[in-house]
Amino acid sequence: MKRLLFILLSFLAAYPLAAQQVMERREALAAGQRVLLNLRPADHIRVRAGREGEVSFKATVSINQNKLNEAFVLQVSRAGEELQVSTDLDKEKLRAAAPGDGDCPGGQGRYYGESWTSGGDGDGHHQQGVCVAIDYDVALPPGTALRVSTWSGNISIAGLTGAIEAKTLSGDVNLSWPPARSAELALKTISGEVYADPAVALLNRRDHPIVGYEVRGTWGGGGGPAVRLESISGNVFFRQQR
């Protein structure tokens, strides 16, 4: 038995498991500059208050059991007074996906690329399922104006006091807001639910709406920064920060 265990361990050592890819960036941010996060593929996006004058960004990536992590693309740029961080997946590299070989068991993952019909994408190539797990952790100065969007990930924001616009197609949006900081609110979902702290003064509440709509309200008497949270099919939460 000991000899068998030794052989097994030796075999595993000879073929190490691929590790998750971790990408980290730090960027200087001057006072008054805005931040745009366009994080298309995502599972969870966590944004928290950090140090003044700096944005820290971390992405933890696993694509097809870490065999296609090189398909993850990160771009950082500046446009006027805005720092822009964008992520995507390289379509050409995704064509190397091999669910039949166990990279994405059952081929049940999502396909990220052009539209396709009958198993082929817009360029006539056969599409393959891609198993993607990507988490982001972002820290920025508390008063920074932020725009963040994603295809299907959950967005969680806490500790910020500047204007916020957060949108996801099918995930949840969860914002914890400081109790002493006033805000103008717009909370919207089409097929999910909007949950707002009882202290929010709702301006256009509807009872038993047939379809989703934009709920508008104020926090702390209003007059503060604009806060817009939106999900197409997920839930939207506005909470008082504890």
Show where each model-derived region lies.
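Sec-dependent N-terminal signal peptides
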Residues: L4-A13
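Sec/Tat signal peptide C-region and signal peptidase I cleavage site
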Residues: Y15-A19
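Short, surface-exposed interaction patches in beta-rich subdomains
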Residues: V22-A28, K58, D88, G159, ...
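Extracytoplasmic
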Residues: A30-G32, R40-A42, G50-E54, N69-V73, ...
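The right-handed parallel beta-helix/beta-solenoid scaffold, focusing on the short coil/turn
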Residues: Q33-V35, D43, Y136, T144-L146, ...
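Mid-chain, structured segments of secreted extracytoplasmic proteins
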Residues: V61-P105
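Acidic/polar low-complexity surface segments
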Residues: L89, A98-G129, D197-G217
